[in-house]
């Protein structure tokens, strides 16, 4: 068999953490009663006019700056025209011709220590569609427009990735960066971060691209990795058998670990984009851009280096802690109180992560650091009590289990 390599590009949709929708004042809160967060604008009623949410522009530009993009200081919105039941306007407001961010990149470190730069073609703003709910028993479908108009950014990479490992490293870097900005919680399971994988294979050493497919319905990093491996093998098998790879969109079934064709890209409709006549072009001034640059936080790589230098943490500890913005907040606040950085790190990486794994096993879903509710002050108090020999390690772990589960104050436990 010939030696093949895989060529991968990603389209990553990120739901922004604004309180209201992109073009109206309806709430973006997740989980409300169906159609309870709607108005004439986000349900496409005739005569309703959109008003741009400034926070969306701020978040989109901030993500662009954090990913080394050039910010388009004069950009605009376009209409993408298509008919579908979850799209009440019969068009989606997006950005085709002048996206807000272009020509960026992120640097990732792979497991063997090598570094790779993955280019970003563009980042654009757009609105989400509604959600269809199918009742197979009754034979009817319902539509919930609560999600219609929720603000998204789409981050489009260049086809620079050559393995599932590189894809996961890129997505992890994006997720961490966006979470540090506070622009999104990036929960794949809840759909606030979604990745579509564009993949083709070619003979190693070739400069020509093969026929690509797009794979959707990937709601975890593990599912993305499995889908990439399966699609790579499928395409190689077709080529080896002398058959043609069809350019198409495929849907991944993670339970059965296979994908099936949804629609052919060759038959894709013309969306007939044109500038949205109801929205004026956006001008981002030099002053506003400078303000956004000044507000950029300390990101993972810088924070990791500081933890090693300032607190004397091992590189492994610093890597684990800075993977989550929540971990860094707990670490820094608890350390400021008890002045025991290594012990705080040990408690986060030991007992905290152990209890998180137990919670994940109980619920059948990943328990994320962002869900932690206990106060750093409580952790600092436990560490101080052990240090003063007022309690032993076994008692400390028992107390921490109550703090973890119930967010109780250590003082209220009568120690």
Task: Indicate where each model-derived feature is located.
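Basic, nucleic-acid-interacting segments
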Residues: 1-297, 315, 336-340
């Amino acid at each position: 068999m010939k030696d093949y390599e895989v060529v991968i590009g990603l389209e990553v949709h990120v739901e922004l953490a604004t309180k209201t929708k992109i073009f109206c004042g309806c709430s973006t809160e997740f989980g409300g009663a169906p159609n309870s967060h709607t108005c004439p604008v986000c349900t496409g009623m005739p005569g309703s006019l959109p008003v741009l949410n400034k926070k969306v522009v701020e978040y989109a530009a901030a993500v662009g700056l954090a990913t080394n993009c050039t910010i388009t200081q004069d950009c605009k919105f376009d209409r993408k025209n298509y008919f579908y039941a979850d799209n009440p306007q019969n068009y989606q407001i997006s950005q085709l011709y002048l996206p807000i961010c272009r020509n960026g990149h992120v640097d990732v470190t792979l497991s063997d220590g090598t570094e790779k730069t993955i280019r970003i073609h563009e980042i654009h703003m757009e609105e989400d569609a509604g959600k269809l709910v199918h009742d197979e028993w009754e034979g009817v479908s319902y539509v919930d427009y609560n999600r219609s108009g929720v603000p998204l950014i789409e981050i489009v990479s260049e086809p620079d990735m050559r393995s599932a490992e590189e894809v996961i490293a890129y997505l992890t870097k994006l997720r961490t960066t966006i979470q540090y900005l506070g622009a999104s919680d990036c929960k794949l399971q809840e759909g606030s971060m979604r990745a579509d994988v564009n993949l083709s294979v070619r003979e190693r050493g070739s400069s020509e691209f093969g026929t690509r497919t797009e794979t959707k319905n990937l709601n975890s990093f593990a599912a993305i990795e499995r889908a990439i491996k399966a699609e790579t093998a499928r395409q190689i098998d077709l080529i080896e058998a002398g058959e043609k790879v069809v350019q198409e969109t495929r849907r991944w079934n993670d339970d059965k670990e296979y994908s099936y064709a949804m629609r052919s890209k060759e038959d894709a409709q013309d969306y007939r984009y044109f500038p949205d006549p109801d929205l004026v072009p956006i001008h981002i001034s030099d002053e506003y851009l400078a303000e956004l640059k000044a507000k950029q936080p300390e990101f993972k790589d810088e924070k990791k280096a500081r933890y090693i230098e300032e607190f004397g943490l091992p590189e492994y500890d610093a890597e684990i802690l800075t993977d989550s913005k929540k971990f860094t907040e707990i670490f820094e606040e608890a350390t400021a109180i008890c002045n025991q950085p290594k012990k705080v790190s040990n408690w986060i990486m030991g007992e905290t992560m152990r209890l998180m794994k137990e919670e994940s096993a109980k619920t059948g879903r990943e328990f994320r650091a962002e869900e932690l509710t206990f106060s750093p002050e409580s952790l600092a108090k436990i560490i101080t009590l052990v240090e003063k020999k007022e309690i032993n390690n076994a008692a400390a772990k028992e107390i921490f289990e109550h703090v973890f589960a119930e967010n109780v104050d250590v003082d209220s436990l009568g120690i």
